[in-house]
């Protein structure tokens, strides 16, 4: 945004063929339509990965969020039917600097632009995404809207809508803080992933009940590669229904929304912990473990999203490059074991096992007296590095060493 001679912000001009991004704080960016025409609003966030845009688009944790890609050139490799992490695109909107006009990849089945349009995803291109991201880093993520096509026109008068009219639509969008979204992205019925790879066709080593709060497809696959039979269950499952699956361990997945609004899932998790089931949580699952143990959660200024975040495993001293997608974090003390606050230490000792080296945000929790641990990032690496794949081995070891009687 530029300033005129009077020092006030100059509002850029636009016409009906443009696409307009309006931020909650009044910032306006004019670019070209990308994907579908129309209107979309949501929380605007940025992702720092150079690759993996198809996995980003289909990650349910991006529900109701407009995603800005920091890497300028997007779409080179097109889209295919193998890389999606779920059955649909979940982002509310998509912003890129320089979309590729050509597709060049042996697996490509179509272009990203066409795929976005086919799925009704309103996008915007050819704006200064670096400038936009720098603004979001300093001001924080916020509500925003992308408007193009008929959404720019006042249907009553035929005139272009004013910035004030567009901004009103943005401000009518719910804030992410306070939203409960995991139910709208969860599976509606249970499905099972059988052991694969070297374990294909064999009896499973372990049975896992994976509660889908927005699960990515690669996560149960990583467990299946290690000989697990994974029952992916809806967020509405009861503890009795989990028990009927006779699992060796319970997993809570990633997902969208504010963990403070996930009261039923937190109570379900406490029942899992009370019963002594080995527990592993990723992302939203980490936040829910934190709250189940009695810690608070809080919203980050601009979050961690991308495939290049450095995280230190405090139990080994090893530094990993990891994939992230979270806007909330657990508020727990770093550098010491403490009694879990819930009910005067009912769950025993716990400590922060991982931290982000960029900002010291809590990236993992390890319980000492019960078989439970979690991480804030994504060891399934879809997309992203495989540095943290050992965490699935750690979960299998936990199930091996803490099998319930009768298993």
UniProtKB/Swiss-Prot annotation:
Pathway: Amino-acid biosynthesis; L-arginine biosynthesis; carbamoyl phosphate from bicarbonate: step 1/1; Pyrimidine metabolism; UMP biosynthesis via de novo pathway; (S)-dihydroorotate from bicarbonate: step 1/3. Keywords: Amino-acid biosynthesis, Arginine biosynthesis, ATP-binding, Glutamine amidotransferase, Ligase, Nucleotide-binding, Pyrimidine biosynthesis. SUPFAM superfamilies: Carbamoyl phosphate synthetase, small subunit N-terminal domain, Class I glutamine amidotransferase-like. The active site is at residues 283, 378, 380. Its EC number is 6.3.5.5. InterPro entries: Anth_synth/Amidotransfase, CarbamoylP_synth_ssu, CarbamoylP_synth_ssu_N, CarbP_synth_ssu_N_sf, Class_I_gatase-like, CPSase_GATase1, GATASE. It is an enzyme of class 6 (ligase). It comes from the Bacteria. GO terms for biological process: 'de novo' pyrimidine nucleobase biosynthetic process; 'de novo' UMP biosynthetic process; glutamine metabolic process; L-arginine biosynthetic process. Pfam families: CPSase_sm_chain, GATase. It catalyses: hydrogencarbonate + L-glutamine + 2 ATP + H2O = carbamoyl phosphate + L-glutamate + 2 ADP + phosphate + 2 H(+). L-glutamine binds at residues 61, 255, 257, 284, 287, 325, 327-328. Residues 1-203 are annotated as: CPSase. Signal peptide: none annotated. Residues 207-405 form the Glutamine amidotransferase type-1 domain. GO terms for molecular function: ATP binding; carbamoyl-phosphate synthase (glutamine-hydrolyzing) activity; glutaminase activity. The keyword Ribosomal protein does not apply. Small subunit of the glutamine-dependent carbamoyl phosphate synthetase (CPSase). CPSase catalyzes the formation of carbamoyl phosphate from the ammonia moiety of glutamine, carbonate, and phosphate donated by ATP, constituting the first step of 2 biosynthetic pathways, one leading to arginine and/or urea and the other to pyrimidine nucleotides. The small subunit (glutamine amidotransferase) binds and cleaves glutamine to supply the large subunit with the substrate ammonia. Belongs to the CarA family. Composed of two chains; the small (or glutamine) chain promotes the hydrolysis of glutamine to ammonia, which is used by the large (or ammonia) chain to synthesize carbamoyl phosphate. Tetramer of heterodimers (alpha,beta)4. This is Carbamoyl phosphate synthase small chain. The lineage of its organism: Bacteria, Bacillati, Actinomycetota, Actinomycetes, Bifidobacteriales. The gene is carA.
């Amino acid at each position: 945004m530029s300033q005129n001679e009077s020092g006030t912000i100059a509002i850029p001009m636009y016409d009906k063929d443009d696409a307009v991004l309006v931020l909650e704080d009044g910032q306006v960016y004019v670019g070209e339509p990308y994907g579908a025409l129309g209107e979309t609003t949501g929380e605007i966030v940025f992702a720092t990965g150079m690759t993996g845009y198809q996995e980003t688009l289909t990650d349910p944790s991006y529900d109701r969020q407009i995603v800005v890609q920091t890497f300028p050139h997007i779409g080179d490799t097109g889209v295919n039917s193998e890389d999606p992490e779920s059955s649909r695109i979940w982002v509310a909107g998509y912003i890129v600097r320089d979309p590729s006009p050509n597709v060049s990849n042996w697996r490509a089945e179509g272009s990203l632009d066409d795929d976005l349009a086919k799925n009704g995803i309103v996008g915007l291109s050819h704006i200064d995404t670096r400038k936009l991201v720098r603004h979001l880093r300093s001001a924080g993520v916020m509500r925003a809207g992308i408007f193009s096509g008929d959404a720019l026109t006042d249907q009553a008068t035929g005139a272009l809508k004013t910035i004030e009219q567009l901004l009103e639509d943005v401000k009518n969008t719910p804030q992410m803080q306070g939203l409960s979204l995991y139910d709208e992205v969860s599976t509606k019925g249970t499905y099972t992933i059988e052991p694969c790879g070297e374990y294909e066709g064999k009896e499973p080593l372990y049975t896992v009940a994976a509660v889908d709060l927005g699960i990515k497809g690669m996560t149960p696959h990583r467990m299946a590669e290690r000989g697990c039979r994974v029952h992916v269950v809806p967020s509405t499952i009861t503890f009795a229904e989990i028990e009927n699956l006779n699992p060796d361990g319970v997993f809570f997945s990633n997902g969208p929304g504010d963990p403070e609004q996930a009261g039923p899932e937190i109570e379900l998790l406490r029942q899992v912990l009370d019963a002594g089931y080995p527990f592993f949580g990723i992302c939203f699952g980490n936040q829910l473990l934190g709250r189940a143990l009695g810690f608070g959660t809080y919203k980050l200024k601009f979050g961690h999203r991308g495939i290049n975040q450095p995280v230190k495993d405090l139990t080994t001293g090893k530094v990993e490059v990891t994939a992230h997608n979270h806007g909330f974090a657990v508020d727990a003390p770093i550098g010491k074991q403490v009694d879990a606050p819930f009910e005067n230490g009912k769950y025993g000792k716990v400590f922060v096992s991982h931290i982000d080296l960029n900002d010291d945000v809590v990236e993992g929790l390890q319980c000492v007296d019960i078989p439970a641990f979690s991480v804030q990032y994504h060891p399934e690496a879809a997309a992203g590095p495989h540095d943290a794949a050992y965490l699935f081995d750690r979960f299998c070891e936990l199930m091996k060493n803490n099998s319930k009687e009768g298993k």
